[in-house]
């Protein structure tokens, strides 16, 4: 026995799927199932087919009714003897009404139904062989689809039914047949007696009655038809003036615009009133400012100093701004750099600068004249000599100040510098300012002086003297020898001693309290 062709498979499934119960999924009820379980002979949707695949082929064997073309005759017989209706009735008879897939197809009812489908399919295969249809597979006749009622056809159709029209047509036919019979009888008897004119008016009455019946009913139908059309809202326009309709529409638009304007007017009035109130508040504030006599400049100054009216939480302010005046500095003078006397070190009492040496020393000829105005000329001469010694020892004369002119002024004429150094690749500052010759002469003299020595140091070459140690400097070598300076020195020493004693006391107290 060969396998069925693809056309046979499509034909069989087309007929099986035409059954109403097979048009929905057996498990979930989805429409148009395209998969089938051969083991139970039921149709399934794609989702339920996946759950059947997870059960295993020993419980449910799944195939597609559209994609698979390698069906066997035994599998087709299983689908023909089965069906959704037979399976659902069998499961209900055996009390299996659960929707759980695992519980449903592992139950006793499912096992019995599998065996039943298998036996029926094997019998049908032996009996029918390769026939497409089975005797037991009865398909109910396809009922024509119900026609949808046409709304317009129902309203347009006449009110008189078909039976009424048939009776109306039958009546005139009977009426017409009767005068015909009478005319025949009259004609037969008229061969001897002659024509009879008594019944001449009868056919005319009959025809009049028939015509009246036929005419009345269509007229009634037309009246009813016209009434139906009016109920649908279709009206015939006659003798209408479109200009009047347009004027009415324009008038309606104008009325609508007026209503919109009337609604918007209160909103605009509220906005205008709020603006007026805001302007009034501003005017009141301006009047208050004018009363307080505060100009723009004073307002800024008061805000900067934190005395503005906006910063006053209580609303009370003082009149300090009324007396404010702006002071401009015409020619600001830069402060002179201060020279500390103890830059190079002092006695063993000091290791850092003190506030007693921060005051600048006025290096003038009469700086110490205020010490004793009643002293004689000899004392004044001595003080002037002391100031000169202080200048020499402290090196104030060597310090460059703003009053000192530079040793070498740059060449004013740029043409001379271009002519002089036009072809030179590199220029030093000594060459540009004319210090090269002097430097060369000094270096030659030093080299000639040190030519006989075995070793030369940088200090010997450049004649640099080693700076004295910080401990060699004393306060007496820096400060001028004056009686006030001696007293000042004594006071400083006493203060330093007190500070040292205080520091020692603090240290000992800390050690006693917290331990060494």
Swiss-Prot record:
Q: Which PROSITE patterns match?
A: ARFGAP
Q: Which UniProt keywords apply?
A: Coiled coil, Cytoplasm, ER-Golgi transport, Golgi apparatus, GTPase activation, Membrane, Metal-binding, Phosphoprotein, Protein transport, Transport, Zinc, Zinc-finger
- Write down the Gene3D superfamilies for this protein, in alphabetical order: Arf GTPase activating protein
Instruction: Give a yes or no for keyword Zinc-finger in this entry.
Output: yes
| UniProt-listed SMART domains | ArfGap
- Point out the coiled-coil segments of this chain: 243-264
Q: Which residues carry this modification: Phosphoserine?
A: 231, 270, 274, 331, 370, 428, 451, 453, 455, 457-458
> What's the name of the protein?
ADP-ribosylation factor GTPase-activating protein 3
């Amino acid at each position: 026995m060969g396998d069925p062709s693809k056309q046979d498979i499509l034909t069989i499934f087309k007929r099986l799927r035409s059954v109403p119960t097979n048009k929905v999924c057996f498990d979930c009820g989805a429409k148009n199932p395209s998969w089938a379980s051969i083991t139970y002979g039921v149709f399934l949707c794609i989702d339920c087919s996946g759950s059947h695949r997870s059960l295993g082929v020993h419980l449910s064997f799944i195939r597609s009714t559209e994609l698979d073309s390698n069906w066997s005759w035994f599998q087709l017989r299983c689908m023909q003897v089965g069906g959704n209706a037979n399976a659902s009735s069998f499961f209900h008879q055996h009390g299996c009404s659960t929707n759980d897939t695992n519980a449903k197809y592992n139950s006793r009812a499912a096992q019995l139904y599998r065996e039943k489908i298998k036996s029926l399919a094997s019998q049908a295969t032996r009996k029918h062989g390769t026939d497409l249809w089975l005797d037991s597979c009865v398909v109910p006749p396809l009922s024509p689809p119900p026609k949808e009622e046409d709304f317009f056809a129902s309203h347009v159709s006449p009110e008189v039914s078909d039976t009424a029209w048939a009776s109306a047509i039958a009546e005139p036919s009977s009426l017409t047949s009767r005068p015909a019979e009478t005319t025949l009888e009259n004609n037969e008897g008229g061969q001897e007696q002659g024509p009879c004119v008594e019944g001449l008016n009868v056919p005319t009455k009959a025809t009049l009655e028939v015509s009246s019946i036929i005419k009345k009913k269509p007229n009634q139908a037309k009246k009813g038809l016209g009434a139906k059309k009016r109920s649908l809202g279709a009206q015939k326009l006659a003798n209408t003036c479109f200009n009047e309709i347009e004027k009415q529409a324009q008038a309606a638009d104008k009325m609508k615009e007026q209503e919109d304007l009337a609604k918007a007017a209160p909103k605009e009035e509220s906005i205008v009133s709020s603006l007026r109130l805001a302007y009034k508040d501003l005017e009141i504030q301006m009047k208050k400012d004018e009363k307080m006599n505060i100009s723009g400049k004073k307002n800024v100054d008061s805000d900067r100093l934190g005395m503005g009216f906006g910063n006053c939480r209580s609303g009370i302010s003082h009149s300090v701004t009324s007396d404010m005046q702006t002071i401009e500095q015409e020619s600001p003078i830069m402060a002179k750099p201060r020279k500390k006397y103890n830059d190079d070190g002092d006695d063993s009492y000091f290791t850092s600068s003190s506030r007693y040496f921060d005051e600048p020393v006025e290096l003038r000829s009469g700086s110490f004249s205020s010490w004793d105005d009643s002293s004689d000329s000899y004392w004044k001469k001595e003080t002037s000599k002391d100031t000169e010694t202080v200048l020499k020892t402290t090196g104030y004369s060597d310090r460059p100040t703003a009053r000192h002119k530079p040793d070498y002024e740059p060449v004013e004429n740029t043409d001379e510098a271009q002519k002089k150094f036009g072809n030179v690749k590199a220029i030093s500052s000594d060459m540009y300012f004319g210090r090269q010759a002097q430097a060369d002469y000094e270096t030659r003299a030093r080299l000639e002086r040190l030519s006989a020595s075995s070793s030369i140091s940088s200090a010997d070459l450049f004649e640099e003297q080693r700076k004295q140690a910080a401990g060699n400097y004393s306060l007496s070598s820096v400060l001028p020898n004056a009686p006030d300076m001696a007293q000042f020195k004594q006071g400083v020493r006493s203060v330093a001693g007190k500070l040292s004693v205080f520091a020692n006391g603090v240290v000992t107290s800390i050690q006693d309290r917290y331990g060494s």
